[in-house]
């Protein structure tokens, strides 16, 4: 800031003790009640030198200072004084005591103020340059020994605030308020239901038009409430049925899975048994080929079921042919021996089984057929077998 002097007779406009200065560039004077320039306290000294601390070129934060007129020395007190004739509350007048110790603000050859950080005692915050608050207009002296102390009301981020406690208290208060609101709502609803019931129970002839309208509204509310209750009851019933059906469905799925596993096990066992059975049949065939009879052994359960199967099985591997009209023929040869065609042999076997009260499957037809092969008699009616040979084959198969 630049300091300018008015009514100056010196060439450079230097400021002296006989001249006062004011701050014309700001609404606040340079030295007001708190003597704050950018939150810093300024200590001035008069060295008695013709050079002024503040010159026209002196820079003090861009604030212009002017001394409009001379000031008088009050009570012959030393130090810088301010004009008492200026009738303004913001101007300070009186003497200023200078500190005896080294000032934090010193002047250099360029007439600029500099601040020394050598001591914390004279820091701008440590020194209180404000006038005595208890003194009147005639005792506004500056004191530098008083230091500003932090009051109990100074700002602190956590002063007066207990965030965790308040948060817990707020949550508890919210829960309490919600529960109280819920209980109050239930009590109001119950009271309203009782009023509606009492109003509905009254006779229409006893009610006024307004009360009749209120009764209709109460009836509507009661009907809606009953509908909601039925709906909720039905919904709960359906939910219970759905839950039961889901449980039953899960049980059925588990049983089905077990049955599938059992089927797989049974199918595997059947395949193993089938494979073993085919192996046994092949072994029987091989043993039959090596037998002394030199004939193919057939499983005893593979016997013919019909007359046709019996005839085909007997004629298999021979050159004989049997006509259908001669298959059941029974006749005598030249020596008087009775001969039976293949069809007649089948019927005779059935008769013998019935006479002996035997099961049809008890006769080994394979053995009978093997004994009959090669003993055919031909007389123009196809292959035929003597009755004596057939009886011998039946007796041998039964034994």
Curated annotation (Swiss-Prot):
GO terms for molecular function: DNA-binding transcription activator activity, RNA polymerase II-specific; DNA-binding transcription factor activity; transcription cis-regulatory region binding. Its main location: nucleus. It is found in: Nucleus. Residues 1-21, 103-197 are annotated as: Disordered. Residues 235-242 are annotated as: Leucine-zipper. Keywords: Activator, DNA-binding, Nucleus, Transcription, Transcription regulation. Residues 215-234 are annotated as: Basic motif. Residues 210-273 form the bZIP domain. GO terms for cellular component: nucleus; RNA polymerase II transcription regulator complex. Gene3D superfamilies: 1.20.5.170, YAP1 redox domain. Chain B. Residues 167-184 have a biased composition (Low complexity). The keyword Transcription regulation applies. One of its GO terms (biological process) is positive regulation of DNA-templated transcription. InterPro entries: AP-1-like (IPR050936), bZIP (IPR004827), bZIP_sf (IPR046347). Residues 103-145 have a biased composition (Polar residues). Belongs to the bZIP family. Transcription factor that confers fluconazole resistance in S.cerevisiae by activation of the PDR5 gene. Can also activate the transcription of S.cerevisiae genes involved in 4-nitroquinoline-N-oxide resistance. This is Fluconazole resistance protein 3. It comes from Candida albicans (Yeast). The gene is FCR3.
């Amino acid at each position: 800031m630049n300091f300018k002097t008015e009514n100056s007779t010196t060439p450079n406009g230097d400021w002296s003790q006989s001249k006062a200065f004011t701050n014309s560039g700001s609404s606040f004077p340079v030295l007001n009640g708190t003597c704050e320039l950018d939150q810093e306290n300024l200590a001035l000294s008069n060295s008695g030198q013709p050079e002024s601390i503040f010159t026209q070129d002196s820079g003090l934060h861009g604030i212009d200072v002017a001394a409009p007129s001379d000031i008088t020395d009050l009570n012959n007190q030393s130090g810088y004084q301010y004009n008492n004739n200026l009738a303004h509350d913001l101007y300070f007048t009186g003497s200023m005591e200078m500190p005896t110790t080294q000032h934090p603000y010193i002047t250099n050859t360029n007439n600029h103020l500099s601040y020394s950080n050598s001591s914390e005692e004279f820091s701008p915050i440590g020194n209180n340059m404000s006038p005595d608050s208890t003194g009147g207009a005639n005792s506004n002296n500056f004191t530098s020994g008083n230091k500003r102390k932090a009051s109990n009301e100074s700002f602190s981020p956590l002063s007066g605030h207990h965030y965790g406690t308040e948060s817990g208290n707020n949550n508890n208060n919210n829960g309490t308020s919600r529960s109280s609101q819920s209980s109050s709502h239930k009590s109001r609803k119950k009271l309203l239901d009782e009023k509606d019931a009492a109003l509905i129970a009254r006779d229409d002839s006893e009610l006024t038009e307004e009360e009749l309208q209120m009764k209709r509204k109460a009836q509507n509310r009661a009907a809606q409430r009953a509908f909601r209750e039925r709906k909720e009851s039905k919904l709960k019933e359906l939910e219970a049925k759905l839950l039961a059906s889901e449980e039953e469905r899960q049980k059925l799925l588990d049983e089905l899975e077990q049955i599938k596993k059992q089927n797989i096990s049974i199918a595997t066992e059947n395949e193993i048994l089938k494979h073993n059975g085919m192996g046994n049949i092949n072994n029987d065939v091989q043993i039959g080929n090596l037998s002394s009879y030199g004939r193919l052994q057939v499983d005893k359960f593979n016997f013919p079921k019909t007359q046709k199967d019996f005839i085909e099985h007997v004629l298999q591997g021979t050159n004989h042919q049997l006509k259908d009209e001669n298959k059941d023929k029974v006749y005598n040869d030249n020596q008087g021996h009775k001969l039976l065609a293949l069809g007649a042999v089948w019927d005779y076997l059935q008769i013998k089984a019935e006479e002996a009260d035997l099961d049809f499957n008890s006769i080994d037809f394979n053995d009978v057929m093997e004994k009959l092969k090669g003993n055919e008699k031909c007389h123009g009616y196809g292959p035929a077998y003597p009755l004596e040979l057939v009886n011998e084959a039946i007796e041998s198969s039964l034994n």
